[in-house]
Regions:
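C-terminal capping/extension of enzyme domains
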Residues: 1-20, 41-42, 83-98, 121-159
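Short, hydrophobic/glycine-enriched beta-strand segments
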Residues: 20-26
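Short beta-strand segments
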Residues: 24, 111-112
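Hydrophobic packing residues within well-ordered alpha-helices of enzyme cores
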Residues: 50, 119-120
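Alpha-helix capping/helix-boundary segments
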Residues: 115-117
Length: 159
């Protein structure tokens, strides 16, 4: 799998004051950490799902999020992790999600995957609706792209 390391989240959230939805993953994959942006592993289907939902090709991922009032971030600020494996995550410190929500117009929070959802429920207490979404990672290969797109349509209702 990979070396076990204690890692601090390497990049900032994508957001501005007009953000309406917050999409939270658990922690960036090795590839995302190398490429310094969210969901950058070629096998992760997050950006394919977004393209299908919004019916457009996404070239500038950060600008796409800002244009559509989407904040991207992760629940975890730092952790011990082996490679990209959520199941190996230990020694978690969470990001200051309440502060981010105070500085934007977040009306709904979406958690992409079981680990993100579990950690959010354990550590974060906000009076904002939070919704579980299935992981777009290749580790969730049992879900086909069309099933993921169907699950993620709820995001459009909150924009």
């Amino acid at each position: 799998m990979g070396e076990i390391k204690h890692i601090i989240h390497p990049f900032e959230p994508v957001y501005d004051a007009s953000s309406k939805v917050l999409i939270l993953g658990s922690f960036p994959s090795v590839v995302s950490r190398e490429k310094n942006f969210y969901y950058m592993n070629a096998n992760n289907r997050f950006w394919k799902v977004m393209e299908a939902l919004f019916q457009k090709e996404i070239h500038d991922k950060k600008q796409f999020c800002l244009d559509h009032h989407i904040t991207l971030w992760d629940v975890i600020y730092s952790c011990t992790i082996e490679g990209s494996s959520d199941s190996s995550i230990q020694n978690v410190q969470v990001n200051d999600i309440p502060l981010l929500c105070q500085n934007s117009n977040i009306q709904a929070i979406f958690l992409t995957g079981k680990k993100a959802f579990q950690l959010y429920e354990k550590y974060i207490d906000l009076d904002i609706e939070h919704i579980y979404l299935p992981s777009t990672s290749s580790a969730n290969a049992k879900m086909h792209l069309d099933q993921l797109v169907e699950s993620y349509k709820v995001i459009l209702e909150k924009l």
